[in-house]
Amino acid sequence: MSSVKVAVRVRPFNSREISRESKCIIEMSGNTTCITNPKVPPGTSDSIKRFNYDYSYWSHDPRDAEFSTQSMVYADIGEEMLQHSFDGYNVCIFAYGQTGAGKSYTMMGKQEESQEGVIPMICKDLFRRIQETEGVDLKYSVEVSYMEIYCERVRDLLNPKNKGNLKVREHPLLGPYVEDLSKLAVTSYQDIHDLIDEGNKARTVAATNMNETSSRSHAVFTIFFTQRRVDKMTSLETEKVSKISLVDLAGSERADSTGAKGTRLKEGANINKSLTTLGKVISALAEVASKSKKSKKADFIPYRDSVLTWLLRENLGGNSKTAMIAAISPADINYDETLSTLRYADRAKQIVCKAVVNEDANAKLIRELKEEIQKLRELLKAEGIEVQEGNRRTPTPMICSPNRLRKRTGSSTEMAVDQLQASEKLIAELNETWEEKLKRTEQIRLQREAVFAEMGVAVKEDGITVGVFSPKKSPHLVNLNEDPTLSECLLYYIKDGLTRLGTSEANVPQDIQLSGSHILKEHCVFENKDGVVTLVPHKDALVYLNGRKLVEPEVLQTGSRVILGKNHVFRFTHPEQAREKREKPKDKDVGENPGGNAEAADWNFAQCELLEKQGIDLKAEMQKRLCALEEQFKREKLAADQEFEEQRKTYEARIDALQKQVEEQSMTMSMYSSYSPEDFHQEEDIFVNPLFESCWTAREAGLAAWAFRKWRYHQFTSLRDDLWGNAIFLKEANAISVELKKKVQFQFTLLTDTLYSPLPPELAPSPIIGGALTNGQEDEFGQSPIPRTIVAVEVTDTKNGATHHWSLDKLRQRLELMREMYHNEAELSPTSPDYNVESLTGGDPFYDRFPWFRMVGRSFVYLSNLLYPVPLVHKVAIVNERGDVRGYLRVAVQPVMDEENADFNNGVKQSARIVFDEEQNGGHKIPKIRTIHDKDEKYIEGSNDIMKLEELEQEDADSGRGDSSVASELHESNEHEPGEHLQPGKEFTFRVTVLQATGIAAEYADIFCQFNFLHRHEEAFSTEPVKNSGSGAPLGFYHVQNITVPVTKSFIEYLKTQPIVFKVFGHYQNHPLHKDAKQDCQITRPPPRRMLPPSIPISQPVRSPKFGPLPCPPSSTVLAKHDVLVWFEICELAPNGEYVPAVVDHSDDLPCRGLYLLHQGIQRRIRITIVHEPTAEVKWKDIRELVVGRIRNQPEPADELDDSDSCVLSLGLFPGEVLEVPGDDRSFFRFEAAWDSSLHNSALLNRVTQTGEQIFITLSAYLELENCARPAIITKDLSMIIYGRDARTGPRSLKHLFSGQYRNPEANRLSGVYELSLRRASEAGSPGVQRRQRRVLDTSSTYVRGEENLHGWRPRGDSLIFDHQWELEKLTRLEEVGRVRHLLMLRERLGMDTTPNPTTKTEKDVCNLAQRASASPVHMVIPPSPQTPVKDQQTPTLPERELTPRETELVWKCVKLIQGRIGGKGDPSDTSNQLAVDASPGDEGCADMNASYISGNSIELCSPDRVDIPNGWEAPAPVPQSQEVSLRLYVPELEEIRVSPVVARKGYLNVLEHGGSGWKKRWVTVRRPYVFIFRSDKDPVERAVLNLATAQVECSEDQAAMVKVPNTFSVVTKHRGYLLQTLGDKEVHDWLYAINPLLAGQIR
């Protein structure tokens, strides 16, 4: 056995590719061929594809050192194949590739020296070796045949008598062969060369008549090579017969690449049918070769689907040594075709051939043929026909009785005669001697010469047609063809006198005979008088001369183009005129003589000339079409712009109206809070009341806008939706991590973009829908929005001691790779080099790269002391992202008033120059900063997020202590012009000194610090790393940085409001590289995909013509879930008039899978039975519609919509009925529908299914349930095979044949498991319905495979939101404390704290309460009620005394402000109780949320539903009971469950149902989380289903003692209980482990 040799050869650019400036996308290195995808960015995983072959020939540029010539190709492939033929093997070489890729050049070559192809070289070398080795004991004989396969028709190219299409037959020994194909004997290479030339000319004549090109046909040149050797010792003659098949395939390009239309498109499809079948054969053979030897199933190879593959059957995977040469183009414009060719060749490389030496086959063959002839004669004699010996044609009937004649059948007689004639032809061919073969070859040559002479084709004196030489004196015509290989192959002499041209049917013999469309019987006459040739057209004949239609006679000039009819193109050549022109050059018109050279006119030139002269200018037509397209584009663009402008105006008007409405509602609600309750009892229009007239000041309007903006950015519900909706993905990732033994854990976390915790770009939130903006942008009020919070995934890498943050999108992307790592095998070609799993997945999806240094925390130092100017030494806290203080940093900031340059012995001194430029942009001042380091100037745009000092003043004014405000005094002192050191235009230098860091944990080894301005994140000033010994001693940096700034307004504004950010980094001690650890990159190879069972995808419902597109199911709470078992049957009309279920093949052994075996042309019905546990919530009323569509021959449905699917059919229905099954108390509902499959107008359903094919359909049943607003939809994909009307649809395997299950009619059904969810229907117009529909279900409790390995781990939920609010509160307090501390230090430095402001007793009490609140977490602060004595709530350090009513009111007001509440004067405890009471007992989710809000006491939403209801208001009246009943509607949702193919356990169990009659032996299969119950192991239909996810499993000795039955355990579902007994003692634990592994582990 040996595999097919595959070589790839790339050709140079052609003129078309050069004109388009194509790029080379092919690279070759050794035997590896690489192709680059020009449509994919370089560097990606799909940009370069590599393939390995036996040979890779680089023939792109002759100047390259690696250039491969024709002789090199022959030396590698041709010589090896020729040696195999001498050894007695069959040999085949075939070339494959798109048109113009170089197939014909590689196989045939050119006439020039060293340009010959593989075929001439093999023939030449064959006869050279014959001459060298032939002797007395060794004789050779060579025969050749040449045929063409075009559109599945075979044509003989060597025998002119075989004008028709030859038949392809198959012999038991010879295999497929072509009947009556000429096999001509040859004795030298010149004979073969002449025959090839003759065959090409016959191919040219036929192609011209039929308007074909050689690129659209396959050519097969076969050499039959026989060796006869005489053994001297035994005097026996042995014989070896080798067959050398040389195949030139048709072009493999696509239809859209060639632009073919009409007939040429159909022709291409027919030709591509052969190539497609060849591809299928190669793929099937490669699949067989890659399968294991244990596979006993016979694989089907589609040889008979095309003539080409049928004839090449021995060469493809049979008795042959085969080589394939794939010719490819190097241009990027042919990427798709080139890649297809490379993949084709890659598959062919895997084919294994089993070649044997062909010895002494003739004697055996002759004997078997004689025996077959004798049997056929006896068969004919029995039928009443006697065939005499030697009579091969006409049978002689015997005299027989009339009864005997009536028994004869004409078809069998004709078939027997046909077989007899074919066998006798083979015997005659085998018995023909070599001399007879040579004589027959000579006769065929003479016949061929006569035929060519009759057609007018010029021949030499020896009878060979003119091909490569041109006459020296006689004028002549040379053919031109679209295919360059067929051009200038035929030459027609113009004799002296008249040369007539027409068809063979003319009354007067024609000298030149043509055929084809638009050629008249007498078409034209060439008159040669004294060397001057005149073309005389006949009436109504289509004759074109140089593109002009010829009506009158005209003299021909050498080089003229003559077109006769539609297809025949010639160039007229007169040697005498050409010689005169060379001697006396004259200026000729370019149109009459292109380029001054007659030979330059080819077929393309003649066609373009014809179009141009007939008034069809291609360039003008293209320009005209282009102009029309441009005009159309302009019109469409103008219309689109106008439509867009109208939509923009409409949306702007709607936005303005909504904005105005929101503002009015906000102002109305503000007025409500100040309106007295008694005023509402007065009967008047409240909006006419002057109280509701807007009389706000600018400050009040700003506060209202601020409150609205703050309310708009609350996002607790969306965060909860993200947590609930993605919990299942988090659980699955953790489960896979545990099963693969990855040391990675995933958990939810919340991230907010703050100063201490800026978000990286990959985690930055997207814009809020509805008008909100992203971070860093300003809203319509000119204010920076509140930072958004996102849900992220915290990845704890315990292997590397690292922590990463992933976005939810990244988690889903990585989860796909985790699933692929766990389930699927990377599909790579076995011949592809550098096989590496990591090249596909990009590394391990569980791990990320981690930096060497990690962030310890951030600090902020304000610079307002430089305004005065005074030096300050700051001690600022180093705070991490969670608000934890990780240490302290001492930083000194001081102005440099003169050019001092003191020496710093222990520190580092550096200088930098920063320029603040002012730029006006949209009315906002934006500092544009540029920094100069080492005299290099860089411009960096600054940030527009600038805090204004006036805001601080407003905050102090709100506190009621304007007289003691720190910022107000500093602001007043700085209202005047800045000091002399900050005059605009001057330069100001200040110094930042990083002194020490204290309190940093010992887990960080090397500590260094970076600091920069807020608007400059890309460049920073950095200190040197300092060792951290962990002893607690301060870490001294003593880094000095001088900064010089030209003073501008932007710089002064920055000094007033903005700090410098300091980032402290440390090297983590537990870094794995400390121990020279290396990341384990080994990835366990996943199981092959072929080991996993094939699955039919779950389709979406087929759209109903009656109901139309149904709205999306609501996201309301699921009230109930039920497991539904559905049985599907297709019934056919039986002879007794009843509808019997069609046979279902369950041979796949997969759950809920089967194949319907139907008959063609029989009436059918579809029967569906629904089985479920009895419940009051599910009551089936009737079937409303049954729709069948999406008819296809592959499992996956097409992407087209049901609207465009013409095969969708609504079936006629029969009323549904409720069944009562004796002994089964489950609910059964069954309905039927009449199915006339012919109404689909689908060929797949109308015809008998082909071998190896299956038909798939999708049906959807729309059922009506009680108390449901919408129909329930059952959707199922069914597969089937349609046999003939009288065919037997039996089982396909012996297992099912002997099991007898097909004799059971109840086995001929298919099961489906569905989950019915009932949701509360929501009114579309109810308030807040859109917000409620946005909520998602909590998926944290959904079962995930492998969840039991997590040992109780759960994803975090609502508590994470409140914990994060406390973290944000800590960050806000730390930021404000740092700013106030800086201002207090500055006041003290300036001497402004000499007279401290008096503090009242009330303020002290408020401060004490605030201190107590800050000392404990927020969720521990429970405010006391006013009735509780204050002394019980105070700390022991405060004096005990009663508060006055005024003090109590102030205390509660301050506490509410701290806790972020806005409300009236009611008691908070009363409000909490009211909220708890209002929560509906049935809505557990809402009750839990309210409880968490109450217990949390954190910041609440400032929405109207959270505002305390003033006294005197009445709650809305409850809904009447009758109205509530009428609105109690559900929305059903039926979803098919994909049952796992993995069987955890199966076997017999004794089953006792609760309330059942007794124990029953049943076959039970566990496919988690379901248990299926069958009647027996031979029963293929699921009879009952148990859902383990909602069941309780118990096994105890007490239970066994109570029932007095050993080896039992119980399974209790929501509706019934089962008692299961195993057949043996040892099986109990195994069954428990399959059903409930945790319970089995506890028992064991």
UniProtKB/Swiss-Prot annotation:
Residues 3-351 form the Kinesin motor domain. It comes from the Eukaryota. Residues 1542-1640 form the PH domain. Residues 574-598, 953-985, 1419-1440 are annotated as: Disordered. Residues 499-565 form the FHA domain. Residues 1428-1437 have a biased composition (Polar residues). ATP binds at residues 97-104. It is found in: Cytoplasm, Cytoskeleton. GO terms for cellular component: cytoplasm; microtubule; microtubule associated complex. GO terms for molecular function: ATP binding; microtubule binding; microtubule motor activity. Residues 358-436, 631-672 form a coiled coil. GO terms for biological process: synaptic vesicle transport; vesicle transport along microtubule. Keywords: ATP-binding, Coiled coil, Cytoplasm, Cytoskeleton, Microtubule, Motor protein, Nucleotide-binding. Residues 574-591, 969-984 have a biased composition (Basic and acidic residues). Required for presynaptic maturation, has a role in axonal transport of dense-core vesicles carrying synaptic vesicle precursors, components required for the morphological transformation of axonal growth cones to mature boutons. Monomer. Belongs to the TRAFAC class myosin-kinesin ATPase superfamily. Kinesin family. Unc-104 subfamily. This is Kinesin-like protein unc-104. It comes from Aedes aegypti (Yellowfever mosquito).
